[in-house]
Amino acid sequence: MIIGIDLDGVTYDSQDIIRTAAEIYDVEHKGKGVVNPKSLYVAEKYDWTKEECMTFLKDIVWMYTFNAPLKPYAKYVIDYLHDQGHKIIFITARGAYSSPHEDVLTKKALEKDHMHYDKILFAQTDKVQAIKDEKVDIMIDDSLDHVKAIAKAGCKVIYFREQGSPEFKHKNVNTVTNWGEIYRIFKTN
């Protein structure tokens, strides 16, 4: 089986770093404060322009790319899946919005964390196309927008739902909140 896995918010717990850094960035740059408190995206939450968001991401890319901790048991479950003969492809939007060196930093972080994978695809803002091109059987992602698009395209997806993220029901979607639940899905099916 070919398994696609997102990095930020799924493999790495980078979301807390991004949320905290965004709050500090907005204060330091005399932003408007929180404008849309329910938004999960920093640009919408603080009503930043595309340029402001790009500047923010470029400023913090090294921090979340290399310093974000792995989600609990992510390595254990990914190693298990890899050892079972599954092909692991990391499919990430990293590199689409920030530093041109984010791919190098990401590969170093994966190496530092001794992560097993077969391939990594960067700057994938259209994950549906990447999934189809790579013939991915199931994708693990935390972005509701990606989950909806993947499910509607007929692909199976595991929605790694963060606290506060909206629910989404679809015949192609399994919803989880941690890597133990992902392990159960693969171990019992």
Q: Where is each model-derived feature located?
A:
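Active-site neighborhood of HAD-like aspartate-dependent phosphohydrolases
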Residues: M1-E52
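Substrate-recognition element of Asp-dependent hydrolases with the DxDx(T/V) motif
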Residues: Y64-P69, A74-T106
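Hydrophobic anchor at the start of a short beta-strand
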Residues: K87-I89, Y117, C155-V157
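Substrate-recognition "cap/lid" segment bordering the active-site pocket of phosphatases
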Residues: G95-I138, L144-K148
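Structural recognition of alpha->loop->beta junctions
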Residues: T106-L121, K169-N189
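Acidic, Mg2+-coordinating phosphoryl-transfer loop and its flanking beta/alpha structural elements
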Residues: M139-N174
